[in-house]
């Protein structure tokens, strides 16, 4: 994998326009911090037609994890985007291709700033939200936004921070997710529980990523009686398993677990039966779209989530999703549109090949397909680190759906659209 340049440089936005959905974008920046990082500088709002993407890469990280490209965090400064490659905290994310999908959803919302969420808020009669204090941005006194020191240390894609939820109405309640292990979160949980005379009976973890499980040690330090009450789909040491359909009950709340892999293999959502609401974890966020491990698996999980017909979503990041069915429809529609474009491009390339007198399936490599979709003048890093992995993942999903296939010719894997007559 090529290391990113040490200094900023302009890249024509046409190279990533279609993949990222950057309507009217003008410039993309690549770089890695050296000396005085511009992350410490104010990020000043730019005219609305401008989109700036700043990608940071630590060469030591790339050498250690050459196939890993961490997901983006998008700062809500009109249409400015910050990305940071970072090994610690949050999660070591995952699939360099599907982060492109995540960018698109966020960028579509950059005309508005993210809403402010209270540190502790009663968002329904049965649900109390406590922010994990691992926000991905900090608003400076001068009104400009810059990256939180916590962002540089770990969490990406955390938006206003990880949402942790205290669920129930009685003395004994359950907790969903534990944040990233930020001391301020532990203090908030302690004061909130003590102030309302609440005791925790169960701790349910949506998945293994560190911005959801990092607070477990603090909980056990403060409440050692919880040592037998930590639940996760694929349990770690000292944890108990959660099975699909398993039900947890406390006064005022019946919570049913639903296995929804995609964002991660062990991802669980939880349905709050009394409210017809779903704790969506990282599969569906309050703002934008989530990065995922396996596109086909994630889309299947979203369709399954649709079938459950929950009205409201309580996401692991971002504001309450007041119309969960519409949000799920939007997520699936956006991904389907990208699949259709790949298939249509393959068909067009076959037609052009046959028009030139060639025979066969008109199969092409991923590199050729990317060129056909995005032009010849692509920056090499944009091609190899973003567009090609993205298109390759979409092709794998389409192959599972029997819409494309590949053949090996000249030692190269070449893809073609399956046309049914």
From Swiss-Prot:
<protein>
    <recommendedName>
        <fullName>Atrochrysone carboxyl ACP thioesterase</fullName>
        <ecNumber>3.1.2.-</ecNumber>
    </recommendedName>
</protein>
<feature type="binding site">
    <location>
        <position position="212"/>
    </location>
    <ligand>
        <name>Zn(2+) 2</name>
    </ligand>
</feature>
<feature type="active site" description="Proton donor/acceptor">
    <location>
        <position position="211"/>
    </location>
</feature>
<comment type="pathway">
    <text>Secondary metabolite biosynthesis.</text>
</comment>
<dbReference type="InterPro" id="IPR047921">
    <property type="entry name" value="LACTB2-like_MBL-fold"/>
</dbReference>
<dbReference type="GO" id="GO:0016787">
    <property type="term" value="F:hydrolase activity"/>
</dbReference>
<feature type="binding site">
    <location>
        <position position="209"/>
    </location>
    <ligand>
        <name>Zn(2+) 1</name>
    </ligand>
</feature>
<feature type="binding site">
    <location>
        <position position="207"/>
    </location>
    <ligand>
        <name>Zn(2+) 1</name>
    </ligand>
</feature>
<dbReference type="InterPro" id="IPR001279">
    <property type="entry name" value="Metallo-B-lactamas"/>
</dbReference>
<dbReference type="Pfam" id="PF00753">
    <property type="entry name" value="Lactamase_B"/>
</dbReference>
<dbReference type="GO" id="GO:0046872">
    <property type="term" value="F:metal ion binding"/>
</dbReference>
<dbReference type="InterPro" id="IPR050662">
    <property type="entry name" value="Sec-metab_biosynth-thioest"/>
</dbReference>
<comment type="similarity">
    <text>Belongs to the metallo-beta-lactamase superfamily.</text>
</comment>
<keyword id="KW-0862">Zinc</keyword>
<keyword id="KW-0479">Metal-binding</keyword>
<comment type="function">
    <text>Atrochrysone carboxyl ACP thioesterase; part of the gene cluster that mediates the biosynthesis of trypacidin, a mycotoxin with antiprotozoal activity and that plays a role in the infection process. The pathway begins with the synthesis of atrochrysone thioester by the polyketide synthase (PKS) tpcC. The atrochrysone carboxyl ACP thioesterase tpcB then breaks the thioester bond and releases the atrochrysone carboxylic acid from tpcC. The decarboxylase tpcK converts atrochrysone carboxylic acid to atrochrysone which is further reduced into emodin anthrone.</text>
</comment>
<dbReference type="InterPro" id="IPR036388">
    <property type="entry name" value="WH-like_DNA-bd_sf"/>
</dbReference>
<dbReference type="InterPro" id="IPR036866">
    <property type="entry name" value="RibonucZ/Hydroxyglut_hydro"/>
</dbReference>
<feature type="binding site">
    <location>
        <position position="211"/>
    </location>
    <ligand>
        <name>Zn(2+) 2</name>
    </ligand>
</feature>
<dbReference type="GO" id="GO:0044550">
    <property type="term" value="P:secondary metabolite biosynthetic process"/>
</dbReference>
<keyword id="KW-0378">Hydrolase</keyword>
């Amino acid at each position: 994998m090529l290391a990113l340049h040490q200094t900023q440089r302009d890249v024509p936005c046409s190279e990533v326009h279609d993949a990222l959905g950057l309507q009217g974008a003008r410039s993309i920046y690549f770089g890695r911090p050296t000396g005085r990082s511009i992350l410490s500088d104010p990020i000043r709002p730019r005219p609305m037609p401008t989109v700036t993407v700043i990608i940071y890469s630590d060469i030591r990280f790339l050498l250690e994890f050459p196939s890993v490209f961490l997901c983006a965090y998008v700062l809500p400064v009109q249409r400015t985007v910050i990305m940071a490659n970072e090994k610690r905290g949050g999660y070591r994310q995952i699939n360099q291709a599907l982060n492109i999908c995540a960018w698109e959803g966020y960028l579509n919302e950059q005309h508005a700033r993210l809403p402010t969420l209270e540190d502790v808020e009663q968002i329904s009669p049965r649900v109390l939200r406590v922010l994990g204090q691992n926000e991905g941005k900090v608003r400076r006194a001068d009104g400009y936004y810059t990256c939180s020191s916590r962002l540089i240390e770990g969490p990406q894609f955390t938006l206003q921070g990880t949402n942790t939820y205290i669920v129930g109405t009685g003395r004994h309640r359950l907790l969903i997710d534990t944040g990233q292990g930020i001391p301020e979160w532990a203090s908030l949980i302690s004061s909130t529980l003590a102030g309302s005379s609440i005791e925790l009976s169960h701790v349910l973890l949506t998945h293994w990523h560190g911005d959801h499980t990092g607070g477990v040690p603090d909980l056990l330090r403060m409440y050692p009686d919880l040592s037998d009450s930590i639940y996760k789909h694929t349990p770690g040491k000292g944890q108990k398993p959660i099975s699909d359909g398993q039900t947890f009950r406390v006064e005022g709340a019946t919570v049913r677990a639903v296995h929804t892999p995609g964002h991660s293999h062990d991802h669980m959502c939880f349905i709050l039966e009394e409210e017809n609401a779903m704790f969506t974890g990282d599969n569906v966020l309050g703002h934008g779209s989530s990065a995922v491990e396996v596109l086909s698996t994630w889309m299947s999980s979203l369709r399954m989530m649709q079938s459950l017909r929950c009205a409201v979503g309580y996401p692991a990041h971002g504001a309450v999703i007041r119309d969960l069915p519409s949000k799920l429809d939007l997520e699936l529609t956006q991904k389907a549109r990208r699949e259709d474009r790949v298939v249509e491009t393959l068909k067009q390339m076959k037609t052009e090949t046959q028009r030139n007198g060639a025979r066969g399936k008109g199969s092409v490599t991923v590199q050729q397909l990317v060129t056909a979709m995005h032009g010849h003048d692509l920056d090499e890093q944009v091609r190899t680190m973003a567009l090609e992995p993205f298109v390759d993942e979409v092709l794998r999903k389409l192959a599972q759906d029997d819409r494309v296939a590949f053949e090996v010719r000249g030692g190269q894997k070449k893809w073609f659209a399956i046309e049914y007559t």
